[in-house]
Amino acid sequence: MTQVTVKELAQEVEAPVERLLQQMREAGLPHTDAGQVVTDNEKQTLLTHLKSSHKSKAEEPRKITLQRKTTSTLRVAGSKSISVEVRKKKVFVQRSPEEIQAEQKREQEERRAAENAAREKADADARQRNEEQARRQAAQAPAAAPVAKAEPAPAAAAPAAPAVPDAPVSEDAAARAAERKKDEARRNESRTRDDDRRGGGVAGERRGEAPRVSIKVKVKEKEKAPTPRAAPRTTDEESDGFRRGRGGKGKPKKRNQHGFQNPTGPVIRDVTIGETITVSDLAQQMSVKGAEVVKFMFKLGTPVTINQVLDQETAQLVAEELGHKVTLVSDTALEDSLAESLKFEGESESRAPVVTVMGHVDHGKTSLLDYIRRAKVAAGEAGGITQHIGAYHVETDRGMVTFLDTPGHAAFTQMRARGAKATDIVILVVAADDGVMPQTREAVQHAKAAGVPLVVAVNKIDKPGADLDRIRNELAVEGVTSEDWGGDTPFVKVSAKMGTGVDELLEAVLLQAEILELKATPTAPGRGVVVESRLDKGRGPVATILVQDGTLRQGDMVLVGSNYGRVRAMLDENGKPVKEAGPSIPVEILGLDGTPDAGDEMSVVADEKKAREVALFRQGKYREVKLARAHAGKLENIFETMGQEEKKTLNIVLKTDVRGSLEALQGSLSSLGNDEVQVRVIGGGVGGITESDANLALASNAVLFGFNVRADAGARKIVEQEGLDMRYYNVIYDIIEDVKKALTGMLGSDVRENILGVAEVRDVFRSPKFGAIAGCMVIEGTVYRNRPIRVLREDVVIFEGELESLRRFKDDASEVRNGMECGIGVKSYNDVKVGDKIEVFEKVQVARTL
């Protein structure tokens, strides 16, 4: 907290110190000296005092006059119109406080007089009621006595005869008295209503006592009266809502009462807390303000903000301390309920094996599959290399086998990893003339990580340089031992070109499948994995699904990762429509709401509501993870990036034909760069380059890359107008090489020094024009004129300058070669000594590389 003295405060507000001390004394502050310290609270007190002392209220107008004028046109016969102007004037007068007090005093006196009158009236009614009660009892007592004596002496009833005429007289008197009370009650009711309008309060309640008494009297007399009448409505009955319709007829209306009542005790809420929850969400569930939760957390010693995320334990502690009931839920509860609903019931049957062909690039994986499928696939791939996962099922003489062909290029690591996870057996293709290569080792690691058995196919065995023993040795180093050497991995010599050994390879694969005893339940709902996905312009999102269990049928509602949809159509690998697909069958499905990621699990769900709920939940989780990764402004990263220069960034908008290629390119391009340059893929997707992609590239100064896709007319128009850089590729090598070249250009160039020659000083001469001249012998390289030099004494640089004069004998020379003598004049330096070395060098710019 910053503290200043009275003198400093006076200088700050530009006021004399004595005047400031006087104002502080008036404000009640204890300061008497200019050197005393003034705290922030005392400043606030002084400011409040000054505001109140200088505040002047403006005279408010006592009378406000409002005038309103409206003009209208009135048409009369003969096509004439008359203008009518209506003026209205309202005057609002503000009364003085004396008038208001006088009126309040007058109202109090009237209220007090009304209370006294009501009290006197109530006393009079009570006395009258007592007198009437006494008269009735006196009139009824003589008549009751002869009745009690009627049994022993019937003649004794004669004295009671004179009392019979008195009964009607008492009833008439009671009726007249009741009529008078009814009129008085009506008058009291009207007075009470008028008093209540002016301000009821306690007096109004007291005024209501007299009508209540009249109600009780009337109820008692109603039992005796021969012709009962309706009791007069009182103020209490009116206030309780017993108002009738016109003329007092109709049913009584229900009282309009306010619905909210303050709770008599604390309200206990059911609070549902996930693994994380924000302070605002927690406060909303407890029906309290967020500031209350923040205040409570401060009391616990944990300063938080209203948007801060709390863990489950902390949120549970806060909710329980505030007296609420807590229910802990897991973030995977929705996923768990989905897993429970997917029941696989039925008899298990044998299924075909799923075989993945893996290996180094150009080792003949696809060519081997071509021979098995009797089709030419490799020729259709750009550059002759596989850039997608291909899924095929083949009917052989020994049964059906499903093959997955994976890319061998280094960029497709994720594709190969997914292929190993979705497979039962891995065929590792190794070229006999090339041996074990980096992607071969990677394929072995993927197979081991997935726990999948290997079958090694030594391809190109018909080539002259084929060496099977070399392959066995190199794979043994990687932990893959041949059966011939006592291991458990079969090695098969094949030639994809000639077809040699293909039958033996299939036999080895089916033998491994029999050992694994692969089972599936065809009657269960379908479950599988996404092999590949793409966005077709005419058909929408298309996903290649490998069914692993159950049966997938057309019309099923499927959940695929964070996407869902109903299967509108299914196609096999040849493009023919099918109605259903059983275990180990790859199919393409149409009808999803987006392109799922390759490797996402597919499952058939019962209804669309469940699928949508889980898909939205997964999308939310993915969005949270993505935002958490992109949030680089965290406190722990601030100090790491402090002092570092900002990297140069190459922004790229990347569109590919399939999801797997997009993932592979994003991973490969993001790994390029160093501490000075980096690649950032700001936009990526599956499908053609659209107008929105071109606008994104324009806004972010990015380069547009299309991999096996093209731009539409709108995108091409924007590219031409704005001069954007858009490039098409169909081979992954080319796009990576071009990005490397672009990053190299962004690095700039380095300045490198090349030593041209070294001369040793043998003697020093004096020249009137140049000063000290060094007589030198060139001992290394060539000495050039007008080049930068360094003077070294005992191999330590003592001066750096420029060679001003170079002579051989008395003639100027442009250069002096090794082993020759010369005279050297150093510009602005005269301290040359015998034994020094003069080093001549040049600075050249060299392009930097990654």
From Swiss-Prot:
Residues 384-388 are annotated as: G2. HAMAP family: IF_2_B (MF_00100_B). Residues 495-497 are annotated as: G5. It comes from Pseudomonas entomophila (strain L48). InterPro entries: DNA-bd_dom_put_sf, EF-G-like_DII, IF2_assoc_dom_bac, IF2_II, IF2_N, P-loop_NTPase, Small_GTP-bd, T_Tr_GTP-bd_dom. The lineage of its organism: Bacteria, Pseudomonadati, Pseudomonadota, Gammaproteobacteria, Pseudomonadales. Gene3D superfamilies: P-loop containing nucleotide triphosphate hydrolases (3.40.50.300), Putative DNA-binding domain, N-terminal subdomain of bacterial translation initiation factor IF2 (3.30.56.50), Translation factors (2.40.30.10), Translation initiation factor IF- 2, domain 3 (3.40.50.10050). Belongs to the TRAFAC class translation factor GTPase superfamily. Classic translation factor GTPase family. IF-2 subfamily. One of the essential components for the initiation of protein synthesis. Protects formylmethionyl-tRNA from spontaneous hydrolysis and promotes its binding to the 30S ribosomal subunits. Also involved in the hydrolysis of GTP during the formation of the 70S ribosomal complex. Residues 136-172 have a biased composition (Low complexity). Residues 405-408 are annotated as: G3. Disulfide bonds: none annotated. Residues 244-257 have a biased composition (Basic residues). Residues 350-517 form the tr-type G domain. Keywords: Cytoplasm, GTP-binding, Initiation factor, Nucleotide-binding, Protein biosynthesis. GO terms for cellular component: cytosol. Residues 50-72, 92-267 are annotated as: Disordered. Residues 459-462 are annotated as: G4. Residues 96-135, 173-210, 234-243 have a biased composition (Basic and acidic residues). GTP binds at residues 359-366, 405-409, 459-462. One of its GO terms (molecular function) is GTPase activity. This is Translation initiation factor IF-2. Its main location: cytoplasm.
